[in-house]
From Swiss-Prot:
<feature type="short sequence motif" description="PDZ-binding domain">
    <location>
        <begin position="147"/>
        <end position="149"/>
    </location>
</feature>
<comment type="function">
    <text>Plays a major role in the induction and maintenance of cellular transformation. Acts mainly as an oncoprotein by stimulating the destruction of many host cell key regulatory proteins. E6 associates with host UBE3A/E6-AP ubiquitin-protein ligase, and inactivates tumor suppressors TP53 and TP73 by targeting them to the 26S proteasome for degradation. In turn, DNA damage and chromosomal instabilities increase and lead to cell proliferation and cancer development.</text>
</comment>
<keyword id="KW-1035">Host cytoplasm</keyword>
<keyword id="KW-0805">Transcription regulation</keyword>
<keyword id="KW-1048">Host nucleus</keyword>
<dbReference type="GO" id="GO:0039548">
    <property type="term" value="P:symbiont-mediated suppression of host cytoplasmic pattern recognition receptor signaling pathway via inhibition of IRF3 activity"/>
</dbReference>
<keyword id="KW-0945">Host-virus interaction</keyword>
<comment type="subunit">
    <text>Forms homodimers. Interacts with ubiquitin-protein ligase UBE3A/E6-AP and thus forms a complex with human TP53. Interacts with human NFX1 and MAGI3. Interacts with human IRF3; this interaction inhibits the establishment of antiviral state. Interacts with human TYK2; this interaction inhibits JAK-STAT activation by interferon alpha. Interacts with host DLG1; this interaction leads to the proteasomal degradation of DLG1.</text>
</comment>
<keyword id="KW-1113">Inhibition of host RLR pathway by virus</keyword>
<dbReference type="GO" id="GO:0030165">
    <property type="term" value="F:PDZ domain binding"/>
</dbReference>
<keyword id="KW-0010">Activator</keyword>
<dbReference type="GO" id="GO:0030430">
    <property type="term" value="C:host cell cytoplasm"/>
</dbReference>
<keyword id="KW-0238">DNA-binding</keyword>
<comment type="function">
    <text>This protein may be involved in the oncogenic potential of this virus (associated with cancer of the uterine cervix).</text>
</comment>
<dbReference type="GO" id="GO:0042025">
    <property type="term" value="C:host cell nucleus"/>
</dbReference>
<keyword id="KW-0804">Transcription</keyword>
<dbReference type="GO" id="GO:0006351">
    <property type="term" value="P:DNA-templated transcription"/>
</dbReference>
Length: 149
């Protein structure tokens, strides 16, 4: 389909334009398990601003099950260190709102509210293979409370 790497669209919106299909019609397979992405996964792929990858000229996305699985594998393999938000701002010489920080679990880019939550709750951001991660609202796990009797 796209043999020349220079002509390959790497964002889903651009791929849709190139093949003249809407996001509601386009079919993508998962690069890992090779299963066809469900429509909700195609929408998530676009919303999470993930990149299309190519194998033998064919475009692939990633299903949510594989995305979460390989995100965990990356965390185990490539974890470097964790820092608080204020330290990260000083280290990068940028405000958090200007940094791309993805969710460590689902890879969704964190919005300003999610980044602020890390500051308010004194949670760290993690450097995984040179990329910064935290937790989005959907993947945030509340701390376990003791049961009152």
């Amino acid at each position: 389909m796209f043999q020349d790497p220079a002509e390959r669209p790497y964002k889903l919106h651009d791929l849709c334009n190139e093949v003249e299909e809407s996001i509601h019609e386009i079919c993508l397979n998962c690069v890992y398990c090779k299963q066809e992405l469900q429509r909700s996964e195609v929408y998530d792929f676009a919303c999470y601003d993930l990149c299309i990858v190519y194998r033998e000229g064919q475009p692939y996305g990633v299903c949510m099950k594989c995305l979460k699985f390989y995100s965990k594998i990356s965390e185990y393999r490539w974890y470097r260190y964790s820092v608080y938000g204020e330290t990260l701002e000083k280290q990068c010489n940028k405000q958090l709102c200007h940094l791309l920080i993805r969710c460590i679990t689902c890879q969704k880019p964190l919005c300003p509210v999610e980044k602020q939550r890390h500051l308010e709750e004194k949670k760290r951001f993690h450097n995984i293979g040179g990329r910064w991660t935290g937790r989005c609202m959907s993947c945030w796990k509340p701390t376990r409370r003791e049961t009152e009797v």
